Amino acid sequence: MNGEIRLIPYVTNEQIMDVNELPEGIKVIKAPEMWAKGVKGKNIKVAVLDTGCDTSHPDLKNQIIGGKNFTDDDGGKEDAISDYNGHGTHVAGTIAANDSNGGIAGVAPEASLLIVKVLGGENGSGQYEWIINGINYAVEQKVDIISMSLGGPSDVPELKEAVKNAVKNGVLVVCAAGNEGDGDERTEELSYPAAYNEVIAVGSVSVARELSEFSNANKEIDLVAPGENILSTLPNKKYGKLTGTSMAAPHVSGALALIKSYEEESFQRKLSESEVFAQLIRRTLPLDIAKTLAGNGFLYLTAPDELAEKAEQSHLLTL
């Protein structure tokens, strides 16, 4: 297992000290409409496998239920999950920043976050073994969702096994598709673990649903979400706008927390990983973009409601 895995590279658009607004990405995927139904991801556990997290950030501290360090940062201390890069803190905020104290809100503001530090240093890189151990730890902790905005060029059998084992245990595994794209649907760019069929691979679009040129193309892309100029939390009580498929993936992880919570209440039972995935795909809008780039389309949490409304209107018109 030579080589390393890295955070999916991202662009820092700006850093901001003081914020009190709902990020555009949260609005355009229709998360607030789910909140209006009383669904905010309560009792859903999301493991964030990344560069760690600023656990004292006011928008995050009440959502974090624990964590573990698998890197050699801080002498490898298991409870040292500080974020020396900012990437992990930003991803965590998009998933579940609390909505009750100003600042920003994440997609699922009442979901619980397990911080699994698998990427170290200021540049956010890690060994395959760290990622594999992090996935296995998240499964042991009985999380509902694993969110990974990381990837590498190598298809490592042990990594695939860890992912398959997570899915077998009912965990939804979400991964950023990667930023090696060239905007051409015919050329494939593969980043692992996103390129594994078992993973929910997320590409990036703008909030106007235009494809991000950097978003990877391949046959395993499942859907796209906002990944450009995404406002979220950064270390030291700051906020910032970042760009990349790294920012798109946590929108889907947060959305899955809402969907799982809502649908299990509706069905009055636990849903399997494949059942929750089916409910996610119901909540997408097809785009006029090749499936190798956009998969099933754009994450849109109210899609079933709007379809039902249209059907009702056309039914009335035919009466």
From Swiss-Prot:
It is found in: Cytoplasm. Keywords: Cytoplasm, Hydrolase, Protease, Serine protease, Zymogen. One of its GO terms (biological process) is proteolysis. Gene3D superfamilies: Peptidase S8/S53 domain (3.40.50.200). InterPro entries: Peptidase_S8/S53_dom (IPR000209), Peptidase_S8/S53_dom_sf (IPR036852), Peptidase_S8/S53_subtilisin (IPR051048), Peptidase_S8_Asp-AS (IPR023827), Peptidase_S8_His-AS (IPR022398), Peptidase_S8_Ser-AS (IPR023828), Peptidase_S8_subtilisin-rel (IPR015500), Subtilisin_Carlsberg-like (IPR034202). One of its GO terms (molecular function) is serine-type endopeptidase activity. One of its GO terms (cellular component) is cytoplasm. PROSITE patterns: SUBTILASE, SUBTILASE_ASP, SUBTILASE_HIS, SUBTILASE_SER. Residues 1-17 form a propeptide. Residues 23-307 form the Peptidase S8 domain. The active site is at residues 50, 87, 246. Its EC number is 3.4.21.-. CDD domains: Peptidases_S8_Subtilisin_subset. Pfam families: Peptidase_S8 (PF00082). Belongs to the peptidase S8 family. Major intracellular protease produced by Bacillus subtilis. Homodimer. This is Major intracellular serine protease. The gene is isp.
